[in-house]
């Protein structure tokens, strides 16, 4: 199919009248949608210069069926009386142009929704760990975004190791980077909780300032070790390319896999929190810390493990983010605010709320950006979230229980 598509694209520019019958046969026989659209456009290009209005009319109708962006350009030129003298052909061109615009609009909307879901999956991975730590400890961890960044740099280091010591298996380095990034960021998160945060419980302003300072230290450490410039993390072949859904819509493989990976992490997190003893203890401490301690739950150890879990999930998000964006020292700063918005909007400590809020914010951002711009879109979304929180402070999904600290 790739070879046929390349040949069809070449024919769009270099097809000759002698190839007209062959093109008509190929258009009738072709089953692949992308190749069929390209061949149809090549055929229409030949027919549009025919002296017969009937042939040109058939070409105009064929262009309307393709839904290709190039067809839109060709049809717009035909609306000029100086280009097309036959009024019947011009009228058909108007109809076909409206048909093409409608198909292109559908492709753009689907593309925006898909981009929003893709962005939402990254926000979900970033906010999932934050929902656990913020819900359990009530700690505003401003260094959480740097866990994303550390996960991305762990992926970069794993890639370098594969390039040096196992170049034949370089295609599998992201699979190895996942546990490495989780382990590294989880250990850093647990160390952070044991050395700094556990001394600041109940003092939110001091915790915020301390974690913000730690985030700056981590950023400077990465700049010293790896440099201030972005590093290159290459996609393996199985994460390159995409699926051609419509002429103006390609769904990249890396984003499709990241969406599936984010949902997989959500399922694993739900199972961990609802089907294991650790999860039971985490939920108990979240709902009533003092009562859980009276029942023998080691709250200090649970705090440390939950913080490590949340940081590890953020590290997994960094692995995913390294496959679709630039990896640099300031990577985490771009996602920390949106992560907090997801947690607050979804409801503290609620997985279902985090999933709903992450995908909702992602789709809203991508739909509003082309309409009013990225900055105004962010402002509008923030204003709507503030209004929503005023009416429903507990978020979309609230913890249910008789006593909540």
Cite the ranges covered by each PLM segment.
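Transmembrane alpha-helical segments in multi-pass inner-membrane proteins
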Residues: 174-179, 304-319, 323-385
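Soluble extramembrane regions of membrane proteins in the secretory/endomembrane system
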Residues: 1-101
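Single transmembrane alpha-helix segments in multi-pass membrane proteins
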Residues: 113-157, 191, 195-206, 283, ...
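Pore- or pathway-lining transmembrane helices of multi-pass membrane proteins that form conduits
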Residues: 146-150, 200-223, 262, 331-344, ...
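Alpha-helical transmembrane segments within multi-pass membrane transporters and channels
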Residues: 168-215, 221, 356-361, 392-393
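Cytosolic-side transmembrane-helix boundaries in multi-pass membrane proteins
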Residues: 200, 206, 210, 225, ...
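Membrane-embedded helix boundary and interhelical linker motif in transport proteins
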Residues: 144-191, 371
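Helix-loop-helix "hairpin" substructures at the membrane interface of multi-pass membrane proteins
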Residues: 250-327, 356
């Amino acid at each position: 199919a790739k070879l046929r598509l390349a040949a069809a694209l070449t024919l769009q520019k270099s097809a000759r009248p002698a190839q007209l019958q062959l093109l008509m046969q190929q258009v009738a026989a072709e089953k692949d949608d992308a190749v069929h659209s390209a061949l149809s456009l090549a055929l229409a290009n030949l027919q549009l210069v025919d002296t017969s209005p009937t042939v040109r009319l058939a070409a105009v109708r064929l262009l309307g069926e393709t839904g290709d962006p190039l067809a839109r350009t060709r049809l717009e030129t035909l609306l000029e009386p100086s280009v097309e003298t036959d009024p019947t052909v011009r009228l058909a061109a108007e109809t076909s142009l409206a048909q093409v615009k409608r198909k292109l609009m559908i492709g753009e909307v689907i593309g925006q929704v898909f981009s929003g879901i893709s962005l939402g999956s990254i926000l979900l991975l970033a906010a999932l760990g934050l929902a656990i730590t913020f819900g359990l400890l009530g700690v505003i961890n401003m260094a959480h975004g740097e866990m994303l960044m550390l996960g991305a740099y762990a992926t970069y280091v794993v890639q370098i190791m594969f390039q040096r010591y196992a170049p034949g298996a370089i295609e599998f380095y992201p699979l190895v980077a996942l546990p490495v990034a989780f382990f590294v960021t989880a250990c850093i998160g647990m160390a952070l909780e044991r050395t700094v945060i556990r001394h600041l419980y109940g003092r939110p302003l001091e915790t915020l300032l301390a974690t913000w300072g730690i985030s700056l230290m981590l950023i400077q450490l990465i700049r010293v070790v790896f440099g201030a410039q972005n590093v290159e993390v290459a996609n393996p072949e199985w994460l390159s390319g995409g699926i051609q859904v419509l002429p103006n819509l390609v769904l990249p493989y890396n984003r499709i896999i990241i969406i599936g990976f984010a949902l997989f992490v959500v399922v694993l997190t739900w199972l961990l929190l609802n089907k294991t003893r650790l999860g039971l203890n985490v939920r108990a401490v979240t709902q009533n810390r003092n009562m859980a301690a009276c029942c023998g739950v080691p709250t200090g150890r649970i705090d440390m493990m939950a913080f490590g879990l949340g940081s590890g999930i953020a590290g997994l998000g960094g692995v995913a983010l390294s496959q679709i964006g630039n990896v640099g020292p300031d990577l985490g700063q771009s996602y920390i605010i949106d992560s907090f918005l997801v947690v607050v909007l979804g409801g503290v400590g609620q997985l279902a709320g985090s999933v709903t809020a992450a995908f909702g914010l992602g789709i809203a951002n991508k739909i509003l950006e082309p309409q009013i711009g990225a900055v105004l879109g962010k402002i509008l979304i923030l204003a709507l979230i503030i209004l929503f929180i005023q009416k429903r402070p507990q978020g979309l999904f609230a913890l249910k229980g008789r006593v909540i600290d």
